[in-house]
């Protein structure tokens, strides 16, 4: 297939792309999730929300329904994650119990979305991979992810209202109140670039168009 040109899209992969990958000349672009080593032909792609895992998996339906009627948030910070997905998550919940909403128990997806909607900010530590579904669920619900600074993530989320911190210990009520403008921006942000047809078309037009 050396005479054919390719644009490659990857998704649902936690293994990061590193500098060891060899890209053939006829590959115009690789749009990849968790592309920690990106640049040149390799561009970061959103990890997005979880795909349907079975015919009865209705989480996407619940998310789309929740997105159509998002109430005003009444609380400041929501903390709900699996403590065992990555060492960065260990002990985080205990840091915020005194003033944030901390969920220790597993809850159904509808309750989770309702909880997201009731908070302006959501703590989003990395999971098994550097990017995770939680980050994008929070944005789709027009809330603000609180994320640890990372060059890859900061490139990926450049156009979106994210509160970046060097350490989660830096997250305080005062810091969140000072960054309330991010919550206001989230109410107005354009989510259309995160729909698959628009995302695909943008990449194809940019890279295929530039190469005839």
What kind of region is each of these model predictions?
Residues 1-163, 174-210:
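Nucleotide-sugar donor-binding catalytic core of glycosyltransferases
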């Amino acid at each position: 297939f050396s005479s054919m040109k390719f644009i490659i899209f990857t998704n649902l992969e936690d293994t990061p792309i590193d500098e060891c990958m060899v890209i053939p000349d006829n590959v115009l672009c690789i749009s990849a999730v968790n592309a920690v080593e990106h640049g040149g032909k390799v561009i970061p792609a959103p990890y997005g929300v979880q795909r349907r895992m079975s015919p009865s998996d209705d989480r996407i339906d619940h998310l789309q329904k929740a997105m159509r009627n998002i109430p005003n948030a009444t609380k400041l910070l929501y903390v709900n994650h699996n403590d065992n997905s990555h060492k960065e998550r260990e002990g985080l919940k205990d840091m915020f119990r005194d003033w944030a909403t901390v969920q220790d128990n597993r809850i159904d997806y509808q309750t989770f979305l309702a909880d997201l909607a009731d908070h302006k900010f959501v703590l989003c530590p990395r999971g098994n991979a550097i990017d995770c579904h939680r980050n994008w669920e929070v944005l789709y619900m027009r809330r603000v992810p609180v994320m640890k600074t990372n060059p890859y993530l900061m490139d990926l989320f450049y156009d979106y209202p994210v509160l970046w911190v060097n350490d989660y210990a830096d997250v305080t009520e005062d810091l969140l109140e000072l960054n309330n403008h991010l919550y206001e921006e989230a109410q107005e942000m354009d989510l259309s670039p995160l729909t698959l047809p628009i995302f695909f078309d943008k990449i194809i037009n940019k890279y295929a168009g530039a190469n005839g």
